[in-house]
């Protein structure tokens, strides 16, 4: 059970992503506004 899973673009109830995020980057679970490479990815960037 990874708590850093990214939600779908429609379920992105996370606050704005970090500033060090690329363009099409969605916010992961409200886990300290973590950014993911793709809103469909399961790995989050710990930046």
Swiss-Prot record:
Source domain of life: Eukaryota
Protein name in the entry: Sperm protamine P1
Localization (cell): Nucleus; Chromosome
InterPro entries named in the record: Protamine_P1 (IPR000221)
Keywords of this entry: Chromosome, Developmental protein, Differentiation, DNA condensation, DNA-binding, Nucleosome core, Nucleus, Spermatogenesis
Tissue: Testis.
Molecular function per GO: DNA binding
Gene Ontology biological-process entries: chromosome condensation; sperm DNA condensation
Function summary: Protamines substitute for histones in the chromatin of sperm during the haploid phase of spermatogenesis. They compact sperm DNA into a highly condensed, stable and inactive complex.
Similarity field: Belongs to the protamine P1 family.
Organism whose genome encodes this protein: Orcinus orca (Killer whale)
One Gene Ontology term, aspect cellular component: nucleosome
Record flagged with keyword DNA-binding: yes
